[in-house]
């Protein structure tokens, strides 16, 4: 457990992709810090499990691949009615899969890009509206070190994460007039269900993956940076990407 604690009592946050991995960790820590949390994901079963962990967690089932503007609006309207305007949001939803240049499944490639990039933009377009967000709200998106180093076989995943990282700078300028902030985080390999599922699907064992200087990351190694960016201590930080990789990028050229 971390010795550094944040107090988000009386604040409201939305976490998209909250049923597993980084999203679940972030939603849980926000609730532990006193915030009301709207946890959004596809799996109703996992969301029900989350809801039982804290009375501060409210849930909504939503598929970011098919969600319309009306769907996002309905979810946020309910949360705002219950607890007031939001103070920020985190978009962690993402999928990966092998998409090499020499041959890839077009449907998979489209789903990868739409989940990471299109979904995050759709969420922000709705969540950053005056009727849903307080002045000075903070938003965090997820990029990846794959967007920096270029990873063989991850053409669309790396491209989608690059798009997220670039979009953050533009969006920061568009929402800054209300004091809103937006930043992204680029983790390396983190021990999550999605990472392990991907490695298994391509026949890679855990030991065959290059880790950072500080070893393989855990969700709680990344969530601390998220909470910092959501907090008032980061009030002068926007439009940036934070590589949170345990030193992975330091060893890129070894």
Range-by-range predicted roles:
Residues 2-3, 227, 238-254:
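Short C-terminal tail/terminal secondary-structure segment
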Residues 19-20:
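Conserved glycine-rich cofactor-binding loop
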Residues 95, 102-122, 140, 164:
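Catalytic Tyr-X3-Lys loop
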Residues 124, 160:
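Active-site helix of classical SDR
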Residues 129, 173-174:
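Alpha-helical segment proximal to the catalytic Tyr-Lys
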Residues 144:
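Residue(s) in the substrate-gating loop at a strand-loop-helix junction
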Residues 176, 181, 237-239:
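Short, small/polar-rich loop/turn modules that mediate ligand/substrate recognition or access, typified
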Residues 211-222:
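A conserved structural motif in NAD(P)-dependent oxidoreductases
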